[in-house]
Structures are given as C-alpha cells and as structure tokens.
Regions:
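An acidic/histidine-cluster motif and surrounding catalytic segment
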Residues: 1-81, 85-259
Length: 259
C-alpha cells in the first residue's frame, strides 16, 4: 500500500455555538495533521492553519475556494470537511483502505452517513460501503475525493453556472443570488447533480458512519443536527464496528487507487 499524501480543507462560517476546534482536534487525532480552514468573516478562529476571507463568499463559493486550494496542493487524496463534525480516530486509516480499493464508479466516499442513508424500510443496512441512489444527496459533511474526480466537479459547466435549484427559488431570489453570489448554497444538491446526472457516477457512504454531525445551530439558519441531519449508527458507539472493522469490497487490480 502506497503512502497517501492528503489535503484536508475545512469550510467554516460564523455560528453562535462554534464546533470548529472540536472538528480540528478530531481530524488531528485521526492523523490528518494539517487541515486548512477557509474561514468566513467573523468565524471562530481555531488552532489550524487558516485562510481568512476578507469578504463573505457564502457556502458554495467558500467550498469552491477550498476545493481549488486542495487541487493545487499536489495531494493524492482530498477531503472536504464542514466545521461541525467529529470523526472516529480510525477514520484516516479506513479512508486509505477504501482509496486502495476505490470503486471505479465512485464520485466520492462520504465518511458521514445520515440516518436515512443507513436504513432501508426501517431496518439497518449491512455494515460496509455502498452507493446511494437518490435524486438529491443529503449532507456534504466529510467527503473523500480522488483529485481527478474533484477537478471534474469544480470545472464542470454546472459548477461554473450554479445559482441554485430553479424549481425551489423564484425569479426575484434567483436575480438576487446572481447579484450577490455569497447567497448561493445547496452544496450537497449541486454535488449530487454533477456526480449522478452529469458524470453518471455514484456517491458512496459507509455504515456505520465514521463521522457525526454535531452542530447545535446552522450557519445558514435552521435546526440543530438531529434526526435526518445526524448519523444513526456511529462507528465505535453502541457496539457498532470501529472503522477498522467495516468491510471494504476488494476491487480488481485495475480498479484500485489510480490518480
């Protein structure tokens, strides 16, 4: 197994009850020693290396900035993270195990799996990794990427032109977002559209979840991380397998980790 050079980027925004330092500490404990935070104005300042935005970029453009930074790092693998998560200490080793048996049709591997992605008809899905079939993905909290795929994402026509879901916003709001790009959000939605519809790839999730969403408030308004906004089965908790115990399907040699 080759040593994998990582670039981990964290998108941070102002919160009444910030969790950023908890996120950084968890990443460090898992072995990601140098995450870089991309911080919106008035955000909590952590101990991590930080790029401070002088003006507000908003959810979408701050994430794009972070993703492009990671792509310029020369890393073998990239992880894009939100500022209100925890990860199990074995998460990096698990992610590298998957990277070395990377599914050919994968858009990304999410270390975070919300409740409704871990059950089917009310019953727990088997432990392992599997693609999710959905029109719109939910929760881009902690995503592992091959650089070649992430580069396709950020350079895609949909990413360049993304304003939001036209069916969900009126003409007035659409025009407002065009004038003020910092209002553009729906990160998880656009990633799902590009991966599923445009690139015809799949989004992979792990069960149990290696990551938990711990927010007590939303940076864009809304409720705390409960119900479908949190993981139901968390690795290493309540008798669930640790990340090192989650089965990873073996791929044929030509399907292994290739940049």
């Amino acid at each position: 197994m080759k040593d994998i050079k990582w670039s981990v980027v964290v998108a941070a925004a102002p919160r009444e009850r910030p969790k950023l330092q908890t996120t950084i500490d968890c990443l460090n404990k898992a072995g990601w020693d140098d995450p870089v935070v991309f911080s919106e104005p008035d955000s909590y300042v952590s101990t991590a290396r930080t790029v401070h935005n002088e003006t507000k970029k908003g959810v979408w453009h701050n994430w794009l900035q972070a993703a492009n930074f990671a792509l310029e790092s020369g890393a073998d693998a990239i992880m894009t993270v939100q500022d209100d998560i925890t990860v199990h200490p074995e998460s990096k080793a698990f992610a590298e195990r998957v990277l070395n048996d990377w599914p050919r049709d994968a858009g990304y591997l999410s270390l975070y799996t919300p409740l409704h992605y871990s059950v089917i008809k009310g019953n727990k899905k088997p432990w392992g990794i599997y693609p999710i079939h959905t029109k719109s993905i939910w929760g881009a909290m902690c995503l592992v990427w091959k650089p070649s795929m992430l580069r396709q994402i950020v350079s895609s026509q949909r990413a360049r032109n993304w304003i939001g879901v036209r069916k969900q916003i009126g003409e007035e709001e659409y025009a407002e977002r065009v004038r003020n790009p910092e209002l553009i959000r729906n990160l998880d939605t656009v990633l799902g559209y590009i991966i599923h519809k445009d690139l015809t790839k799949k989004t992979y999730y792990c069960n149990p979840s290696c990551c938990q969403h711990i927010s007590e408030d939303s940076s864009i308004g809304g409720r705390a991380a409960t119900g479908k906004r949190a993981a139901r089965y968390v690795a290493g908790e309540e008798g669930n397998p640790r990340p090192s115990e989650i089965p990873v399907p073996k791929q044929e040699p030509k399907k292994a980790f290739l940049l």
